[in-house]
Curated annotation (Swiss-Prot):
Coiled coil, from the record: none
PANTHER family the record matches: ANKYRIN REPEAT AND PROTEIN KINASE DOMAIN-CONTAINING PROTEIN, ANKYRIN REPEAT-CONTAINING PROTEIN-RELATED
UniProt region (PRANC/F-box-like), positions on chain: 390-478
Name listed for the protein in its UniProt record: Ankyrin repeat domain-containing protein M-T5
Biological process, per Gene Ontology: symbiont-mediated perturbation of host cell cycle G0/G1 transition checkpoint; symbiont-mediated perturbation of host cell cycle progression; symbiont-mediated perturbation of host ubiquitin-like protein modification; symbiont-mediated suppression of host apoptosis
Function: Substrate-specific adapter of SKP1-containing E3 ubiquitin-protein ligases which mediate the ubiquitination and subsequent proteasomal degradation of host target proteins including CDKN1B. Disappearance of host CDKN1B correlates with cell cycle progression through the G0/G1 checkpoint. Therefore, viruses in infected cells are protected from diverse innate host antiviral responses normally triggered by G0/G1 cell cycle arrest.
Gene3D superfamilies hit by this protein: Ankyrin repeat-containing domain
Sorted UniProt keywords: ANK repeat, G0/G1 host cell cycle checkpoint dysregulation by virus, Host-virus interaction, Modulation of host cell cycle by virus, Modulation of host E3 ubiquitin ligases by virus, Modulation of host ubiquitin pathway by virus, Repeat, Ubl conjugation pathway
Chain ranges passing through the membrane: none
Subunit field text: Interacts (via PRANC/F-box-like domain) with the SKP1 component of the host SCF ubiquitin ligase complex. Interacts (via N-terminus) with host AKT1.
RNA-binding as UniProt keyword: no
ANK repeat residue intervals: 32-63, 67-101, 105-137, 177-210, 250-279, 283-312
Length: 483
């Protein structure tokens, strides 16, 4: 077996055999546009010792005319070598390999390095730049160093800094679609976007004007949502580029996609940021009916705490009405039973918020007749139960500025009703406030002493005075007095 056959076919290279063959055969002998030297550099078991043997026998470190590519580009592109490729590349450079020589296939050593995510570290890039490599080269795809690096799997801010500091441009567009570096990074790294890199690219002049940029940001956000990727800092960055209620060509908003893909974390984030759940897409859907269609109980409950428009209620109830109608026709009995709690929450909220009649949804009323009647009775009773011109309904559902302790007695009557969860929440807050109020009243009395003006005031007046303070004011005043 000759040197070419040994290097190309042997499962494991033995250095003693390789040394013997190199004494006989030319390491730069061209065969099918390849030399034994370049073939050796493509192997997974290429070592510095083996490379030293080739160099000792006179192998050309810049390759021979007619070969596929240069030895340095071969090593830098060989991902099978892992971190070993860095040591081999440095060995070639120390032996005289040209770091700026374009290989016969049009590639440059720096671009080969930046494509290889095993070795494209800031340290090695700095080494190449110190050895005189040019950062103004372009590959066969037209990309410069920054675009090439952005498309690799290992994008680190320190490496980008080294390239930009050496003069590499961040303004290279994508040759196929016209995306800039920032957009390419967002598209290529949906799961691993780093907000520091995004800010770095934006700070160095990447075009962020609307139009294509807004479309790319929105589409990237949709991909993140569909993959379940949540990064609050990256989302904050995206929403500096587009609106929280941005709509794509189909009139979908980001929160629409959260509901469609059941992405709870981004859904909660968008609601916190003030996303409008009532926006209607071109299919005529808003978030509430999409959540009902998906059977997502969590999202339905979260949405019902927001202000829902009558039309949004109508669409959601039409979904429920249709599902109940389909029980006998399509065997959906188990489906409706499984989502009964969700449907009841929707009905309960609709009866509370809307002046429209639930009876128009015939199948809903037939199926949930007792529950619907109970909701209506309790709603009407709460509206009729009035204390000091304020109804229990207004007190329980935040239609007055703040419930008072005097409302506890009449609120307690509705603890076991269909709106009991809301009433319990109000009562808990009132009891907590009463505890804070009582503590502050007693603390002021202790501070003033038995002969003070505060102590001589009637008890109900003392409590009325403190009751006008907000929770934060009560807390701050107590802390100051206690200190």
């Amino acid at each position: 077996m000759d040197l070419y056959g040994y290097v190309s076919c042997t499962p494991r290279i033995r250095h003693d055999v390789l040394d013997g063959l190199l004494n006989v055969y030319d390491p730069d002998e061209l065969c099918s546009r390849d030399t034994p030297f370049r073939l050796y550099l493509t192997r997974y078991d290429c070592t510095p010792e083996g490379l030293r043997l080739f160099l000792t026998r006179g192998a050309d470190v810049n390759g021979v005319r007619g070969s596929r590519t240069s030895p340095l580009c071969t090593v830098l592109s060989n991902k099978d070598l892992g971190n070993e490729a860095e040591a081999l590349a440095k060995q070639l450079i120390d032996a005289g390999a040209d770091v700026n020589a374009m290989a016969p296939d049009g590639r440059y050593p720096l671009l080969c390095l930046l494509e290889n995510d095993r070795i494209n570290t800031a340290r090695f890039v700095r080494y190449m730049i110190d050895r005189g490599t040019s950062v103004y080269v372009r590959g066969t795809d037209g990309y410069g160093p920054v675009q090439t690096y952005i498309h690799s799997k290992n994008v680190v801010l320190d490496t980008l800094r080294e390239l930009v500091r050496a003069g590499a441009t961040v303004h290279d567009p994508d040759k196929t679609y016209g995306f800039n570096v920032l957009q390419c990074y967002m598209i290529a790294h949906v799961r691993s976007s780093n907000v520091q890199i995004l800010r770095f690219l934006l700070r160095h002049g990447v075009d962020s004007s609307r139009g294509l940029h807004a479309t790319v940001m929105f589409n990237t956000l949709e991909r993140k949502i569909s993959h379940g990727v949540f990064n609050r800092k990256v989302l904050d960055f995206i929403f500096t580029q587009i609106s929280i209620n941005e709509q794509n060509s189909l009139d979908f908003t980001p929160i629409n996609y959260c509901v469609i893909h059941n992405d709870r974390r981004t859904f909660d984030y968008l609601l916190e940021r003030g996303a409008d759940p009532n926006v209607v897409n071109f299919l005529g859907n808003s978030c509430l009916d999409l959540a009902v269609l998906n059977g997502n109980k969590y999202m339905v409950h979260r949405l019902l705490r927001k202000t829902i428009t009558p039309d949004a209620y109508t669409r959601a109830l039409n979904v429920v009405n249709s599902n109940i109608y389909s029980i006998k026709s399509y065997g959906m009995s188990e489906f409706v039973k499984r989502h009964g709690t969700l449907y009841k929450a929707l009905i309960r909220s609709f009866v509370k918020d809307s002046d429209r009649e639930i009876f128009t949804y015939v199948h809903i009323y037939d199926y949930f007749r007792e529950f619907v009647d109970e909701c209506i009775r309790e709603r009407d009773a709460m509206k009729a139960d009035v204390l000091d011109a304020v109804s229990v309904f207004d007190t329980a559902f935040g239609l007055v500025a703040r419930p008072r302790w005097k409302h506890v007695r009449i609120l307690s009557k509705y603890v076991r009703g269909v709106y009991g969860d809301r009433v319990k929440k109000i009562l808990r807050s009132l009891h907590k406030r009463r505890f804070k109020t009582d503590r502050l009243v007693r603390r002021i009395a202790d501070l003033c002493g038995p002969d003070g003006l505060w102590t001589r005031l009637p008890v109900e007046v003392r409590y009325s005075v403190v009751d006008y303070l907000t929770d934060d004011e009560i807390h701050d005043l107590f802390v100051k007095i206690h200190a």
